[in-house]
From Swiss-Prot:
Species in which this protein is naturally found: Macaca mulatta
GO biological process: purine nucleobase catabolic process; urate catabolic process
Catalytic activity: urate + O2 + H2O = 5-hydroxyisourate + H2O2
Gene name linked to the record: UOX
Name used for this protein in its record: Uricase
Phosphoserine modifications at: 39, 63, 232
Cellular component aspect of the GO annotation: peroxisome
Record-listed N6-succinyllysine modification sites: 10, 23, 221, 228
Enzyme class: oxidoreductase
Motif (Microbody targeting signal): 302-304
Residues that bear N-acetylalanine: 2
Highest taxon listed in the record's lineage: Eukaryota
Family matches, as InterPro entries: Uricase (IPR002042), Uricase_CS (IPR019842)
Modified residues (Phosphotyrosine): 289
Length: 304
């Protein structure tokens, strides 16, 4: 180590853009027991800290480093003493702990993902302590806080896989010498929704209810009315319609990012077997797939 220090030479042509270190995928199952009625939150948490000095990078000096094993243990202890009311509140608790406990921590960033457990229910009666894994959209959040500022909270849903068998088409696109895709007025539309939004303020927000509301709005706009659906001329239009509906219904959010892969299902040609397949048997293709993204935010004038 001494030889390393003696051979160190500063490079004046380089500067740090951003640094961080931490612990990823710290898993916790928190059980809240109210008599025989139990509630659970299972989460996977990742923590990144930025320190005021760079001597660990520049000199191999570890004297300012909070070990990542300590970070893991801190997440466990905060779950015990603070509980997990919502993953957003848990993320804020973690940021605030490290910023208040260590003066040389200048930035804390926390990602929390909730494992989707749902309480068992039958005929309107909820089970007191049994749950079923229901992967119908994963709730996640990102919390970032600088020493000089309030926490910035993003929430989102991912892995929300949806499909409709009609009321979707794709026409009027550019055709050149490499185009083989035919226009279609009626097709299957399947996607796996990734949707993330930012809260413009964090006080008195019911994060759980807001997440549920936005998830329901995504499904509402994708599917349309239950008796007839709603036509989608493109994935892009559906994506934008989800954003417009969400920001109009949920005043707590400032912007929204959505990514929608276009998961393809193609009609299987059975003509060589003397059969006519009228879009009854389709072939799912995992890849390649189209990917449509978009982010919108409120204009400044709309907030005045």
């Amino acid at each position: 180590m001494a030889d390393y220090h003696n051979n160190y030479k500063k490079n004046d042509e380089l500067e740090f853009v951003r640094t961080g270190y931490g612990k990823d995928m710290v898993k916790v199952l928190h059980i809240q027991r109210d008599g025989k009625y139990h509630s659970i939150k299972e989460v996977a948490t990742s923590v990144q800290l930025t320190l005021s000095s760079k001597k660990d990078y520049l000199h191999g000096d570890n004297s300012d480093i909070i070990p990542t094993d300590t970070i893991k243990n801190t997440v466990h202890v905060l779950a015990k003493f603070k509980g997990i009311k919502s993953i957003e509140a848990f993320g804020v608790n973690i940021c605030e702990y490290f910023l208040s406990s260590f003066n040389h921590v200048i930035r804390a960033q926390v990602y929390v993902e909730e494992i989707p457990w749902k309480r068992l229910e039958k005929n309107g009666v909820k089970h007191v302590h049994a749950f079923i894994h229901t992967p119908t959209g994963t709730h996640f959040c990102e919390v970032e806080q600088l020493r000089s500022g309030p926490p910035v909270i993003h929430s989102g849903t991912k892995d929300l896989k949806v499909l409709k068998t009609t009321q979707s088409g794709f026409e009027g696109f550019i055709k050149d010498q490499f185009t083989t895709l035919p226009e279609v007025k009626d097709r299957c539309f399947a996607t796996q929704v990734y949707c993330k939004w930012r809260y413009h303020q964090c006080r008195d927000v019911d994060f759980e209810a807001t997440w549920g509301t936005i998830r329901d709005l995504v499904l509402e706009k994708f599917a349309g009315p239950y008796d007839k659906g709603e036509y989608s001329p493109s994935v892009q239009k559906t994506l934008y319609d989800i954003q417009v509906l969400s920001l109009s219904r949920v005043p707590e959010i400032e912007d929204m990012e959505i990514s929608l892969p276009n998961i393809h299902y193609f009609n299987i040609d059975m003509s060589k077997m003397g059969l006519i397949n009228k879009e009854e048997v389709l072939l799912p293709l995992d890849n390649p797939y189209g990917k449509i993204t978009g982010t919108v935010k409120r204009k400044l004038s709309s907030r005045l």
